[in-house]
């Protein structure tokens, strides 16, 4: 299973790289679950990341404003991100979600066909009025995305597993694979929960808090030793 670790600056990115993370995912935690960082931070982290190691960028917990979101996606792409992650926070229906993601895919693939577009929904969508998480694979498929992902919108200590059973997560993974896409799961995931994700066939696991001091995504800092421990579990 591939490990995605989400640094907020270059110093944390070096820790994630030295710890062995497969994907370096540029994020800005104060702006939310998939908070967007600045273009220059993405660029700096891309330059600091060894060739062959992929860089991802979250572009925000986005509203239903396809034009705005598409411009943000384009900005992340030209700043050097290989993966473009879109948090479908303000889309209230399947159609709105597809509308956003289809336009994002068009913009990103215009820059590079090899760029990877991630449609991210939320396991706790019921708390924010978002799209049902089990609809996300269809959204990703119909918008031409490469990856369907789930995270948690509200960071209050509850994990992915507090909002969805392992059976529902397995259903999400299987449907994503049926459509020929990769599946990514995140959401305050603890190191001891990772084997369950491996068991259901998850392709990519995303973490920040688990790789930070005190397990704190906001106040903590990513440490390479913690990343190494997570890598070991992912690769076992």
UniProtKB/Swiss-Prot annotation:
EC id: 4.2.3.153
Pathway note: Cofactor biosynthesis; methanofuran biosynthesis
Active site, renumbered: 27, 85
One GO process term, biological-process aspect: methanofuran biosynthetic process
Catalytic activity: 2 D-glyceraldehyde 3-phosphate = 4-(hydroxymethyl)-2-furancarboxaldehyde phosphate + phosphate + 2 H2O
Coiled-coil intervals: none
InterPro entries per the UniProt record, alphabetical: 4HFCP_synth (IPR007565), 4HFCP_synth_arc (IPR035081), RibuloseP-bd_barrel (IPR011060)
Entries under Pfam families matching the protein: 4HFCP_synth
Alphabetic keyword roster: Lyase, Schiff base
Gene Ontology MF term list: carbon-carbon lyase activity
Keyword presence, Lyase: yes
Main enzyme class: lyase
Primary role: Catalyzes the formation of 4-(hydroxymethyl)-2-furancarboxaldehyde phosphate (4-HFC-P) from two molecules of glyceraldehyde-3-P (GA-3-P).
Family: Belongs to the MfnB family.
NCBIfam families, alphabetized: PRK02227.1-1, PRK02227.1-3
Protein name: (5-formylfuran-3-yl)methyl phosphate synthase
């Amino acid at each position: 299973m591939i490990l995605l670790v989400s640094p907020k600056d270059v110093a944390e990115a070096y820790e994630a790289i030295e710890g062995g993370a497969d994907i370096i995912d540029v994020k800005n935690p104060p702006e939310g679950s998939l908070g967007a960082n600045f273009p220059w931070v993405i660029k700096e982290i891309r330059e600091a990341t060894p060739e062959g190691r992929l860089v991802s960028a979250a572009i925000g917990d986005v509203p239903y404003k396809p034009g705005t979101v598409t411009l943000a996606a384009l900005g992340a792409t030209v700043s050097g991100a290989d993966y473009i992650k879109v948090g479908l926070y303000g889309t209230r229906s399947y159609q709105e979600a597809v509308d956003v993601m289809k336009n994002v895919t068009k913009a990103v693939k215009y820059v590079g066909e090899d760029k990877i577009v991630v449609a991210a929904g939320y396991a706790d969508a019921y708390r924010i009025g978002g799209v049902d998480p089990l609809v996300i694979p269809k959204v990703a498929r119909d918008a031409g995305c490469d990856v369907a992902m789930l995270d948690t919108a509200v960071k209050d200590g509850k994990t992915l597993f507090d909002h969805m059973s392992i059976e529902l997560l397995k259903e999400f993974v299987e449907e994503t694979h049926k459509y020929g896409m990769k599946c990514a799961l995140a959401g305050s995931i603890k190191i001891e929960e990772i084997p369950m994700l491996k068991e259901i066939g998850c392709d990519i696991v995303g973490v920040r808090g688990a790789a930070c001091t005190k397990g704190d995504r906001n106040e903590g800092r990513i440490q390479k030793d913690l990343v190494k421990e997570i890598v070991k579990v992912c690769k076992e």
